[in-house]
Swiss-Prot record:
Function of the protein: Binds with high affinity to muscle nicotinic acetylcholine receptor (nAChR) and hinders acetylcholine binding to the receptor, thereby impairing neuromuscular transmission. Competes with the binding of alpha-bungarotoxin on muscle AChR (from Torpedo) with an IC(50) of 0.30 uM. Causes muscle paralysis, spasms and increased respiration.
Annotated protein name in UniProt: Short neurotoxin 3
Parts forming coiled coils: none
Signal sequence interval, chain numbering: 1-21
Lineage start: Eukaryota, Metazoa, Chordata, Craniata, Vertebrata
GO terms under cellular component: extracellular region
Length: 79
């Protein structure tokens, strides 16, 4: 009985994500699982040609500079 209980506990631990990991957008549709020390999703605009701007997205440890930065700390919040 103890062996069965121990086995169930081990399977549960292996299947669950016990350490919370943040997921952010890296591109328009691509996502990335952040490293444990990266606790912020960011988005900012990178100037491009002809007055256009390209959004840069990803994970970080702090809010980066740039044009119109958006920083947040929940999954997929940097759309």
């Amino acid at each position: 009985m103890k062996t069965l209980l121990l086995t169930l506990v081990m399977v549960t631990i292996m299947c669950l994500d016990l350490g919370y990991t943040l997921t952010c957008y890296k591109g328009y549709h691509d996502t990335v699982v952040c490293k444990p020390h990266e606790t912020i999703c960011y988005r900012y605009l990178v100037p491009a040609t002809h007055g256009n701007a390209i959004p840069a997205r990803g994970c970080g440890t702090s809010c980066p500079g740039g044009n119109h930065p958006v920083c947040c700390s929940t999954d997929l919040c940097n759309k």
